[in-house]
């Protein structure tokens, strides 16, 4: 799935929302560590095992080439301010209508409408991929 949009946040900052690509791998991992240390409401803590840079590159490449999954990044001042995505739950008849949604926003950008916009983008992508159920 492909996505690209330039938006203006509530404070007037310009933000580019686009697919994450392989060259974003290090910045994506840095964003993971940052945001997972800013709140207890994400799935893991920053010190729990995550992806290596090659694994993150592969993950972003797979999402970019997928027809039913996506990983988007929000870029502000050349840095990742947020990430969000949808991943299929399964490929069996009983699960292929379901997708998981995940999102993380740098606390510096909370309250500016970025999370709302990225959530709307992921919901639209899920609908386009014919998912009937989106799970947080």
Model-derived features: where do they sit?
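A short beta-loop-alpha structural element at the N-terminal edge
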Residues: 15-28
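Conserved acetyl-CoA pyrophosphate-binding loop and the N-cap/start of the following alpha-helix
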Residues: 109, 113-121
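Short acidic N-proximal helix/loop "leader" segments that mark the beginning
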Residues: 1-11
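Conserved GNAT acetyl-CoA-binding A-motif
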Residues: 119, 126-136
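An amphipathic alpha-helix signature
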Residues: 25-33, 53, 57
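Helix-loop element at the rim of GNAT/NAT acetyltransferase active sites that forms part
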Residues: 30-47
């Amino acid at each position: 799935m492909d996505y690209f949009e330039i938006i203006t946040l509530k404070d007037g900052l310009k933000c580019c929302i686009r697919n994450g690509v392989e060259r974003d791998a290090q910045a994506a991992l840095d964003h993971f560590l940052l945001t997972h240390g800013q709140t207890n409401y994400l799935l893991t803590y920053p010190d729990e095992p995550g992806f290596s840079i090659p694994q993150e590159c592969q993950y972003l490449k797979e999402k970019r080439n997928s027809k039913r999954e996506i990983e988007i990044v929000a870029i502000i001042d050349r840095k990742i301010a947020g990430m969000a995505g949808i991943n299929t739950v399964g490929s069996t008849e009983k699960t292929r209508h379901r997708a998981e949604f995940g999102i993380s926003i740098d606390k510096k950008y909370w309250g500016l409408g970025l999370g709302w916009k990225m959530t709307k983008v992921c919901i639209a992508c899920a609908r386009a991929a014919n998912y009937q159920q989106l799970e947080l």
